[in-house]
């Protein structure tokens, strides 16, 4: 099935990939992205762990409908979550470049 050298190379490659993944996950955890809604009237900043760091609301919205403000805050958070997920996928896919992974195998994000 595997030759002695082939298995050793596979194990070495797996260890290198694991080290790269740990480094990238640490980088992602330190990142912050900002999602927006209502053409920038509401902004939500989250970190790589999807924890909310900051919410900014344009003062003009404070006189408007409470329901609309709540909807915009949720939309901004969802936008920020989508953005950090895209960054995670992009960084993690860079790890597997050049590796011969089985069809259907996806790197964990």
Curated annotation (Swiss-Prot):
One GO CC annotation: cytosol
Keywords: Cytoplasm, DNA-binding
Location in or out of the cell: Cytoplasm, Nucleoid
Molecular function terms from GO: DNA binding
Main location (coarse class): cytoplasm
Key word Metal-binding present: no
PANTHER family for this protein: NUCLEOID-ASSOCIATED PROTEIN YBAB (PTHR33449:SF1)
Function field: Binds to DNA and alters its conformation. May be involved in regulation of gene expression, nucleoid organization and DNA protection.
SUBUNIT field: Homodimer.
Family per record: Belongs to the YbaB/EbfC family.
Name of the protein in question: Nucleoid-associated protein BU482
The organism of origin for this protein: Buchnera aphidicola subsp. Acyrthosiphon pisum (strain APS) (Acyrthosiphon pisum symbiotic bacterium)
């Amino acid at each position: 099935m595997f030759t002695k050298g082939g298995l050793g190379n596979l194990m070495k490659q797996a260890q290198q990939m694991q080290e790269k993944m740990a480094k990238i996950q640490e980088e992602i955890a330190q990142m912050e992205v900002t999602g927006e809604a209502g053409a920038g009237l509401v902004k939500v900043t989250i970190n790589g762990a999807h924890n909310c760091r900051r919410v900014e609301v344009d003062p003009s919205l404070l006189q408007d409908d409470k329901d609309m403000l709540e909807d915009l805050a949720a939309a901004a958070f969802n936008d920020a979550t989508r953005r950090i997920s895209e960054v995670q996928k992009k960084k993690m896919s860079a790890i597997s470049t050049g590796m011969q992974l089985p069809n259907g195998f996806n790197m964990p994000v």
